[in-house]
């Protein structure tokens, strides 16, 4: 008789105010202080992939005869709480607030600089 396996518990989602293409700064971990553009967001896992940050090496087997294997470096994901939006003009990281315009649209605004992102 087979045993029942439990499903992994769903991660509680946090509000991610980070989007693809944003410039962020890492505020915790081994890459603290580095900045880069967000390549991809994983909202169900509360994680982001940042260009040039948290690099991992992976060994690939050869795909064809006569071809040698290789070592590939690629970005691994970071938890969204470990990055903060970064103002490239003022060179400072800042928290984000959501501002509702008079026409009802929502915009993201950096609290320190007042810079509107959307």
UniProtKB/Swiss-Prot annotation:
UniProt signal peptide: none
Keyword annotations: Ribonucleoprotein, Ribosomal protein, RNA-binding, rRNA-binding
CDD domains in the cross-refs: KOW_RPL26
Annotated GO MF terms: rRNA binding; structural constituent of ribosome
Keyword RNA-binding in annotation: yes
UniProt xrefs under Pfam families: KOW, ribosomal_L24
InterPro entries recorded: KOW, Rib_uL2_dom2, Ribosomal_uL24, Ribosomal_uL24_CS, Ribosomal_uL24_KOW, Translation_prot_SH3-like_sf
Record GO biological process: translation
Record PROSITE patterns: RIBOSOMAL_L24 (PS01108)
Ribonucleoprotein keyword on record: yes
Entry's Gene Ontology cellular component terms: ribonucleoprotein complex; ribosome
Purpose: One of two assembly initiator proteins, it binds directly to the 5'-end of the 23S rRNA, where it nucleates assembly of the 50S subunit. One of the proteins that surrounds the polypeptide exit tunnel on the outside of the subunit.
Classification via NCBIfam families: rplX_bact (TIGR01079)
Protein family according to the UniProt entry: Belongs to the universal ribosomal protein uL24 family.
Quaternary structure and partners: Part of the 50S ribosomal subunit.
Protein name listed in UniProt: Large ribosomal subunit protein uL24
Source organism: Synechococcus sp. (strain CC9902)
Originating gene: rplX
């Amino acid at each position: 008789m087979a045993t029942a396996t439990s499903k992994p518990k769903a991660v509680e989602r946090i509000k991610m105010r980070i989007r693809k293409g944003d410039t962020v700064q890492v505020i915790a971990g081994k890459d603290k202080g580095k900045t880069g553009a967000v390549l991809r967001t994983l909202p169900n896992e509360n994680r982001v992939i940042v260009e040039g940050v948290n690099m991992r090496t992976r060994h690939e087997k050869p795909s064809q005869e006569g071809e040698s294997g290789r070592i590939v470096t690629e970005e691994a994901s970071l938890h969204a709480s470990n990055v903060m939006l970064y103002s490239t003009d003022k060179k400072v990281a800042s928290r984000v607030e959501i501002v509702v315009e008079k026409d009802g649209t929502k915009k993201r605004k950096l609290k320190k600089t007042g810079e509107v992102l959307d």
